[in-house]
């Protein structure tokens, strides 16, 4: 599972998840991708479950790129512990995913195989997602009259 090798602070603030993702909004490595439609925390277990679902469906064909990494720790106090007496112990790791972020990419397979593999992966995630293709036009729109 994905965990950071070392961190500066073991216990982090929760933070806000306002707005869209700043980077990682375009497909960089593969031909097809899974884009987040809403913002959420994605745990390292959910990322691993999605990866396994994709790779098992694709068998030995294609390549998978994971574009998110769980670098934020979250804490939890034990069950039955009263309020107060400090922050709880670190319980796991999450990736902060904002809407518009490409989470997974697939290359080297046909579109219907990629679509089904990413659908299986999206079933393992707690957010709404959409299937995206790499845009064929390089320059985008032009203003030539």
Curated annotation (Swiss-Prot):
RNA-binding: present as a keyword of the record?
A: yes
What keyword terms does UniProt attach to this protein?
A: Ribonucleoprotein, Ribosomal protein, RNA-binding, rRNA-binding, tRNA-binding
InterPro entries attached to this UniProt entry:
Ribosomal_uL16, Ribosomal_uL16_bact-type, Ribosomal_uL16_CS, Ribosomal_uL16_dom, Ribosomal_uL16_sf
- Give any single GO term for biological process: translation
Which Pfam family is an annotated match for this chain, by its short name? Ribosomal_L16
Task: Mention one GO molecular function.
Answer: tRNA binding
Q: Which domain of life is it from?
A: Bacteria
- Entry's Gene Ontology cellular component terms: cytosolic large ribosomal subunit
Q: How does it assemble?
A: Part of the 50S ribosomal subunit.
Q: HAMAP family, from UniProt?
A: Ribosomal_uL16
Function statement: Binds 23S rRNA and is also seen to make contacts with the A and possibly P site tRNAs.
PANTHER family attached here? 50S/60S RIBOSOMAL PROTEIN L16, LARGE RIBOSOMAL SUBUNIT PROTEIN UL16M
Q: Name the protein family.
A: Belongs to the universal ribosomal protein uL16 family.
Q: What is the name of the protein in this document?
A: Large ribosomal subunit protein uL16
**Gene name, Swiss-Prot/TrEMBL:** rplP
